[in-house]
Amino acid sequence: MVRVINADPEMGTSLTEGEAKEFMTNRTILHLGTVDSKGEPSVTPVGYYFDSDSNKIYIPTHKNSKKVRNLSNNKIVSFCIDDPNPPYKGVRGKGEVSIHEEIDYNRLIAEKLLMRSLGSIEHPTSKWLLGEIEKGNEVILEISPRYYSTWNYGKAK
């Protein structure tokens, strides 16, 4: 169970834990915040896979990406998944990241992400990503969230 906080108690209501999980399961883009060695923030939109049973968030990325370099200094990240269309709602939070380099494990996670986002592992983008994983060029970031801060302006006060 992850602690759920109301992000804007003055205006909107919070999503329940179940609503937050459903929302995270059905979205495709997450904004990932890391901090570089100079202490400067970096926010990147990424595709992700959310496992609602474990509350883990998985993100494929190149092993030499700025995200991975930043995580070598600081394993704590922030994230935001939101709907830019009214009624606005979303989930943001903070968590600790583990970096997975195991090809078989990474392929399994990537296939789940690709089936959800592209509908097929035969899609050209799917084939490219899975090929990069097989070459060992891609890693999987696993976020263990500490909390969710949620908002739902569709249920405004």
Predicted regions and their residues:
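Charged, gly/pro-rich active-site loop segments
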Residues: M1-S14, G90-K157
